């Protein structure tokens, strides 16, 4: 793709590596990187970074926590941990088990066996079919779909305008903050 359009700037506005930076209404930051052109190791870049900790899932699974988190988590008692170092693998395994999501706990074996991307594709498909079969609301609704899909088009508009900020439309017409938290619908 790159070699086809690089000599035709009218049809190729992107670089090989595109970064989309978003700031939410609640002041959170999201960075999405897309690069399928340059040679480099495969990395899904599933990473969360915040003032109380850091989590990276693939290809290297590691976690770091702020001092107050380390002080309040019983698993850290008696273990000397620097907040700028990854926690020891043994403690990481204990925490992963302690905070494992119930859906993953139930489906992880079959998900890893038959599902792509470490099982996440299977989980998403499983939840869609489960909700449809049981007449439950889907985990992702039409507003999620619109928000996820608009990122590509809004990124294009930003690139065409010198990487200018672009407002994300409020597809919910003002109801974006009415849902309290997030939960999975389950059949009785």
Per-range role (PLM):
Residues 41-44, 49-51, 56-59, 70-188:
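C-terminal helical cap and adjacent loop that interface with cofactors, partners, or active-site loops
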């Amino acid at each position: 793709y790159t070699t086809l359009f690089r000599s035709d700037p009218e049809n190729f506005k992107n670089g090989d590596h595109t970064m989309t930076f978003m700031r939410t209404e609640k002041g959170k930051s999201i960075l999405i990187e897309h690069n399928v052109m340059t040679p480099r190791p495969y990395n899904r870049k599933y990473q969360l970074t915040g003032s109380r900790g850091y989590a990276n899932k693939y290809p290297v699974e590691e976690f770091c926590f702020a001092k107050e988190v380390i002080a309040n988590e019983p698993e850290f008692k008696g273990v000397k941990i620097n907040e700028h170092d990854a926690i020891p693998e043994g403690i990481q395994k204990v925490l992963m088990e302690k905070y494992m999501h119930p859906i993953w706990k139930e489906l992880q074996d079959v998900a890893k066996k038959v599902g792509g991307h470490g099982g996440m594709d299977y989980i998403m498909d499983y939840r869609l079919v489960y909700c449809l079969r049981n007449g439950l609301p889907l985990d992702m609704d039409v507003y999620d779909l619109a928000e996820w899909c608009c990122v590509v088009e809004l990124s294009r508009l930003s690139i065409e305008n010198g990487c200018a900020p672009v407002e994300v439309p409020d597809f919910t017409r003002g109801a974006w903050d009415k849902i309290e938290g997030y939960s999975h619908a389950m059949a009785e």
